[in-house]
Curated annotation (Swiss-Prot):
One of its GO terms (molecular function) is nutrient reservoir activity. Residues 1-105 are annotated as: Disordered. The keyword Cytoplasm does not apply. Developing endosperm. It comes from Hordeum vulgare. It comes from the Eukaryota. This is C-hordein. Residues 23-39, 70-83 have a biased composition (Low complexity). The keyword Kinase does not apply.
């Protein structure tokens, strides 16, 4: 009799865990469709850059020509204001004007 009572007890806990594993596979199923999406996007990405590459090559030589001209002018403008600031400290009466200019900035 005691031997029979042992198998009866384990039979009850077995059916209880059954509903738990049923929920777990449902979570795994949505993970599967997420994987194929990135695979499809990877194929689309390489197709786009191929046609875009030949287009920028002819445009690049035209754009850099006007660009270098602008920075040269900007550098020259920065050098000009630096020159008048140097002679100002040589004169005794103008250091006051320098203070006002720095305060305004």
């Amino acid at each position: 009799q005691p031997q029979q009572s042992y198998p009866v007890q384990p039979q009850q806990p077995f059916p209880q865990p059954q509903p738990v594993p049923q929920q777990r596979p449902q979570q795994a199923s949505p993970l599967q469709p997420q994987q194929p999406f990135p695979q499809g996007s990877e194929q689309i990405i390489p197709q786009q850059p191929f046609p875009l590459q030949p287009q920028p090559f002819p445009q690049q030589p035209q754009q850099p020509l006007p660009q270098p001209q602008q920075p040269f002018r900007q550098q020259a403008e920065l050098i000009i204001p630096q020159q008048p600031q140097q002679p100002l400290p040589l004169q005794p009466h103008q250091p006051y004007t320098q203070q006002t200019i720095w305060s305004m900035v």
